């Protein structure tokens, strides 16, 4: 099949064509998943860092500033999740990945690989933002730091509880929701709303991380490491708590069986699949 076409070879409206999903190797699927996590986290960190810097420079009213920051982050997450969730689940967050591993729905080695590519994507996204801005606008590249009066214990607790809320929502609408496709279709919006709520609540106290990768990228390029460990231990503990809560108390018992009868079946999205 040629790489480029002079004319569009088919459209979804062409009744003479049938789109079939071709089986692919596990290695190719896993590679696509890792690349999806890499590029998704890259875009998230780039947009989050840029929007935070823009709000801090352009908006003097603190309420408007926080609203702008949390809305941009929430909508950015929702848009990216909608675009690539069919490939990797679009976790974009080591805390979410740890939560998925804790539930048993994701393998440990898969989770480690996801986290590595998320962190590399965060580094590239923060580096791109640093390269995009004049030195005057760089500052700390929106690295997350504790506010005055917020000690280590409070910062850890705030990040842990709020991230557990975010991961709780992710697991509920995207991981443990096997039976209602209507909820799956709006899952990115629900996750985006959880990000808006979490960032809006935490912004004043901890900078609103909820995501170790989001804090890691800007910290590297701005050399902002003061109590950085909070933004790893807090969210990851929150992810573990949410994962255990779903696994022990809220999950249904499911049974995995072989697909019966036919070689072809109709997929969730209505396209014929082999």
Swiss-Prot record:
Residues 55-66, 127-154, 207-229 are extracellular. Keywords: Cell membrane, Membrane, Repeat, Transmembrane, Transmembrane helix, Transport. One of its GO terms (cellular component) is plasma membrane. It is a multi-pass membrane protein. SUPFAM superfamilies: Aquaporin-like. Its main location: membrane. A motif (NPA 2) lies at residues 211-213. GO terms for biological process: water transport. A motif (NPA 1) lies at residues 93-95. May form a water-specific channel. This is Aquaporin C. It comes from Dictyostelium discoideum.
């Amino acid at each position: 099949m040629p790489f480029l076409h002079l004319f569009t070879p088919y459209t979804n409206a062409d009744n003479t064509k049938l789109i079939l999903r071709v089986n692919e190797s596990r290695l190719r699927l896993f590679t696509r998943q890792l690349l999806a996590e890499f590029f998704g986290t890259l875009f998230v960190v780039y947009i989050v860092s840029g929007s935070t810097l823009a709000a801090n420079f352009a908006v003097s009213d603190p309420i408007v500033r926080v609203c702008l920051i949390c809305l941009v982050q929430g909508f950015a997450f929702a848009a990216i999740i909608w675009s690539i969730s069919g490939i990797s689940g679009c976790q974009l967050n080591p805390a979410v990945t740890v939560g998925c591993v804790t539930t048993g729905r994701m393998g440990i080695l898969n989770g480690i690989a996801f986290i590595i590519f998320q962190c590399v994507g965060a580094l590239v996204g923060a580096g791109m933002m640093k390269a995009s801005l004049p030195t005057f606008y760089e500052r700390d590249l929106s690295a997350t730091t504790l506010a005055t009066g917020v000690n280590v214990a409070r910062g850890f607790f705030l990040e842990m509880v709020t991230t557990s809320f975010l991961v709780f929502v992710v697991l509920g609408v995207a991981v443990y929701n096997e039976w209602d496709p209507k909820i799956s279709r709006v899952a990115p919006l629900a996750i985006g709303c959880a990000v808006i709520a979490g960032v809006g609540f935490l912004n004043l106290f901890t900078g609103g991380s909820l995501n170790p990768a989001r804090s890691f990228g800007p910290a590297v390029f701005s050399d902002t490491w003061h109590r950085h460990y909070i933004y790893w231990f807090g969210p990851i503990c929150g992810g573990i708590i949410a994962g255990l809560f779903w696994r022990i108390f809220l999950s249904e018992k499911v049974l995995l069986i072989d697909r019966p009868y036919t070689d072809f079946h109709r997929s969730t999205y209505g396209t014929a699949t082999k």
